Every structure is written in structure tokens, then in C-alpha cells.
Amino acid sequence: MPKMKNNKGAAKRFKKTAGGIKYKHATKRHILTKRTTKNKRQLRPNAILPKCELAAVARMLPYA
């Protein structure tokens, strides 16, 4: 039986850790002048994926 393939887009965006699957927040790349300092600071740390999304990401990353 052939090996299953990872979804390459998901592999670049998500990382499996002991605490769950972590990812970076969206809307933090460019045109940040309209965002407040508080909002940019809150988007800084990596986030942990919520439970409702775990199954979808697990399907995309079979070996994670």
C-alpha cells in the first residue's frame, strides 16, 4: 500500500506539539498601520487550534 501524502499547505502552516496543534494568527503580514498596537500585540503569540478544527487538520497531516 502506498504512503499517504501530507497536504503541503497544511504542513507549512501547522505544527504538532504536546499541547496541541499550533499555528500563527492571520492578518499580521502587511498594511498594519490601521491596526492598533494592542491588536498587533495580541496577534503575536502562536495560537492553539480549537477542538472543532482538529479532525480536519489531522486528515490533512496523517503523519503529524
Swiss-Prot record:
Signal sequence interval, chain numbering: none
InterPro entries to which the protein is assigned, alphabetical: Ribosomal_bL35 (IPR001706), Ribosomal_bL35-like (IPR021137), Ribosomal_bL35_CS (IPR018265), Ribosomal_bL35_sf (IPR037229)
Gene Ontology MF, one: structural constituent of ribosome
Any one of the GO CC terms: cytosolic large ribosomal subunit
GO biological process, alphabetically ordered: translation
Similarity field: Belongs to the bacterial ribosomal protein bL35 family.
Name of this protein: Large ribosomal subunit protein bL35
Organism name: Vibrio cholerae serotype O1 (strain ATCC 39315 / El Tor Inaba N16961)
